[in-house]
């Protein structure tokens, strides 16, 4: 049988397949990996691996552009975005493009421009990917040493890490620039029901910004997911951008310390596992953010959060029954607690009934009615504005509870709208992807550690039936 290792560098993995099958000159015999192992065949071919990565970026950007134009083509301005299954236009609207007071869409042209720009970019990336995969040099080390690398070269790896960190930091600063100088961003808390505004008074206090990281993740605290004003969000991006850029410069200029050299596994598969672990964490955090946070993800575009829809229902019926003459301050419910209002364990006045579990919801349509001790009875009697009633009735009937076949709304709510909320889509997809990436992290971390220890030999396949079958080709 033919040898299964590259003469350039032995790789401790056996993947037996059809040894004579050749794919573009990168066959199992020279790499130790069969065709179905994908980019593993390119571990030591930096030029071809560059092509694979650039082409992958092209696919991502192509999806963004094509899906963006698809959403623009299907968009109906008379309906809220969240009723139309949109997930990209809400992000553009949140950045302040094309919308005005109350989140009303005034102009879809910026969305069209965004889609076209992404499509053009994807063509450039696609061409670069195909060029490097098929025509460019197989390895970059000889012709372009700056872009070349050896996986176990710790200094080069941290330099590459530094470059990536600087790019991430610049990305964070792009949001800061948009919020400060280029038209501002959409603020759901703007008086009268939300508007686009420039963020002028940034929160730069480290106590406030890093205080979020020290909060408990549970109800009433909510860790970083509890952020509820744009000054903190944009200020946080100033901090994050600065840390990423400075950390990137640090990693470019320094070599890893001895403890870091000992602590980490320095191989391509190890770096893959670290990256998958990081993406997994991002996915889980994004899941919580889009599900619970109505400042970074305004309800005008993404629909109400679960707690928000529930509190909106309590508010809507409080308004109705108060008009019909009920004394909402003293009416008793079936459990003996307040029917419309009650006290939380810490003494705040909150909505009564089953929605009591969501007493710590904060939403722009509700906060004006709070006083120093929770909901203010006199404000509930005198100060409720028509826009607050309209918005809560709308949110009540758009709870983010849709199942796979779009049975939206609460089971007992005959007025609920039959739809699946973008919050449901985005939270579920990011949780599932975060989980899969975590499993991938464990898998590749285990293989990388085993290979580093020298005992990863693959599965013993002496008795595998496929070895005795006729080759596919």
UniProtKB/Swiss-Prot annotation:
Q: Provide the binding site for [CaMn4O5] cluster.
A: 367
Q: Name one GO cellular component term.
A: photosystem II
- Where's it mainly located? plastid
Query: Propeptide positions in this record?
Result: 1-14
Spans traversing the lipid bilayer: 69-93, 134-155, 178-200, 255-275, 291-312, 447-471
Q: Which residues carry this modification: N-acetylthreonine?
A: 15
> Which protein are we looking at?
Photosystem II CP43 reaction center protein
The species this protein was found in = Sorghum bicolor
């Amino acid at each position: 049988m033919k040898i299964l290792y590259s003469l350039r560098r032995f790789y401790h993995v056996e993947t037996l397949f059809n040894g004579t099958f050749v794919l573009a000159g990168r066959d199992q015999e020279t790499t130790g990996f069969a065709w179905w192992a994908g980019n593993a065949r390119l571990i030591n071919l930096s030029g071809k691996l560059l092509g694979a990565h650039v082409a992958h970026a092209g696919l991502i950007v192509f999806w963004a552009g094509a899906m963006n134009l698809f959403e623009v083509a299907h968009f109906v301005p008379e309906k809220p975005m969240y009723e139309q299954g949109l997930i990209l236009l809400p992000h553009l609207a949140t950045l302040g493009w094309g919308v005005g007071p109350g989140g009303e869409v005034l102009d879809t042209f910026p969305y069209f421009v965004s889609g076209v720009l992404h499509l053009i970019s994807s063509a450039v990336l696609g061409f670069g990917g195909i060029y490097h995969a098929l025509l460019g040099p197989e390895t970059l080390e000889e012709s372009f040493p700056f872009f070349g690398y050896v996986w176990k070269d710790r200094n080069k790896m941290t330099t590459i890490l530094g470059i990536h960190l600087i790019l991430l930091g610049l990305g964070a600063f792009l949001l800061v620039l948009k919020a400060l100088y280029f038209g501002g961003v959409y603020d759901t808390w703007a008086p009268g029901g939300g508007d686009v505004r420039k963020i002028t008074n940034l929160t730069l206090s480290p106590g406030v910004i890093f205080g979020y990281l020290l909060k408990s993740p549970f109800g009433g605290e909510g860790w970083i997911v509890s952020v509820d004003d744009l000054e903190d969000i944009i200020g946080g991006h100033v901090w994050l951008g600065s840390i990423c850029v400075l950390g990137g410069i640090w990693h470019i200029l320094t070599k890893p310390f001895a403890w870091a050299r000992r602590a980490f596994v320095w191989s391509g598969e190890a770096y893959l596992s670290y990256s998958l672990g990081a993406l997994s964490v991002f996915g889980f955090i994004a899941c919580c953010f889009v599900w619970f946070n109505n400042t970074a993800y305004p309800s005008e575009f993404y629909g109400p959060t679960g707690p928000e829809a529930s509190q909106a229902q309590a508010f809507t019926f409080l308004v109705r029954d108060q008009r019909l003459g009920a004394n909402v301050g003293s009416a008793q419910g079936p459990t003996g607690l307040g029917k419309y209002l009650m006290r939380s364990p810490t003494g705040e006045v909150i909505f009564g009934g089953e929605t009591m579990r969501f007493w710590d919801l904060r939403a722009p349509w509700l906060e004006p009615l709070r006083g120093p001790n929770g909901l203010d009875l006199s404000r509930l009697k005198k100060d409720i504005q028509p826009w607050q009633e309209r918005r809560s009735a709308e949110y009540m009937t758009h709870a983010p509870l849709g199942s796979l076949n779009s049975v939206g709304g609460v089971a007992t709510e005959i007025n609920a709208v039959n739809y699946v909320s973008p919050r449901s889509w985005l939270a579920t997809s990011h949780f599932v992807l975060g989980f899969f990436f975590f499993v991938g992290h464990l898998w590749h971390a285990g293989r990388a550690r085993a290979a580093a220890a020298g005992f990863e030999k693959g599965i013993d396949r002496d008795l595998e039936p496929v070895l005795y079958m006729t080759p596919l080709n």
